[in-house]
Amino acid sequence: MIHFLEQYFVELVTVTSIIYLTLAIILLLYKTPDTAVYKTFRRSKRLMAGGMGLISLNIWIWIASFTGSWTEYNNWVPCFDIILFYLMSICFSFSLSSLLDPHYISRKRCRAIAVKFTLTAFFALIAMTDALKAYQLPLLLIALAGLLEMLIGHIYYFNKCYLRSNALFENYFSNEKSHFIRWLKVSHWLFYGMLILGVISIRSGALINWLLQFYVVGMNLYILVNIINYADEYETLMKANVDKEEEEKMGEASPKKAFIETLRPRVAEWTLEKSYLKEQFTIDDLATKLYTNKTYLSTFIKEEFGMNFSSWIASLRLEEAKKMMRAHPDAKLKDIAYNVGFSSLPYFSSVFAKSEGVTPSAWMKEISRNKEE
């Protein structure tokens, strides 16, 4: 079996390199709205395509340097791998992070990355010179440390961005929206898995390298499908990103007491009308109806109810759902979930269990048991 894997590995990677290049071209040709909102998305799309193209290039460099023997190693391979892994990391990290934070790709960050990449590439290249052959391993380790520094910094910032985006969505949309960006986190870790396997594969046999190619093909297909699907929701989700200049102008100060007294009866009237049963609306929509702005309304909800916008709407819907469940114990949970404004039964069950400590079905059984007693 190992002999078969070794014999046909070049053919395999030739096919996979063409697949990566094809996926990159599909991504580049995929049309998005030619509007200012999608400017960051288009840039992220191009960066992701560039990353896929670099994976293909990495394979062709390996094919060119492969001697046909799995016991002989070309010392230039680790050098080029570190340089190309760094460039891939820039493409993938910049692409994924900017889809969460439109301001991620700044001149300051680009200058810093350019300097770090130059230093990393310098140490990787001089490690291959005959004059410094005795110091090859330490120099390669320094270059590898440069790559790791970049990756660790990105992991920290990406997770910070991811948590911030979830918080923004919770305080802007009435329904849960975090599942629309979950693929970014999955893609983020899939990419790091690829890098780890890539480093391991440098000195591994054909089996590990075959598995790596299947893994990378799957990763790139997953990213391609999700980034195309994400395009449909991108404009809506970006509404939750508070403009920095607007935020600075409005500040985070609490509304004046007189304004709170004015807003309180408006909110009370809105809740009595049960307008929160509408499936999807944003804090902007509600602020317009209440003749205020989202900053004041968000602050009011936090001070008045001790929770963010999404949690407040969910609590109102849960109370309505419990009334329906008491009145109609034979009703389907799916129908109740939709009737009170939840977008899906799993989301309703998750919110209900988090609030009540039991699932909706268990809660209904308990209510029925109490009635019989």
Regions from the language model: what does each represent?
Residues M1-F122, P138-I142:
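N-terminal low-complexity or simple alpha-helical regulatory segments
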Residues T295, L345-P346:
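Key DNA-contact positions within bacterial/archaeal DNA-binding proteins
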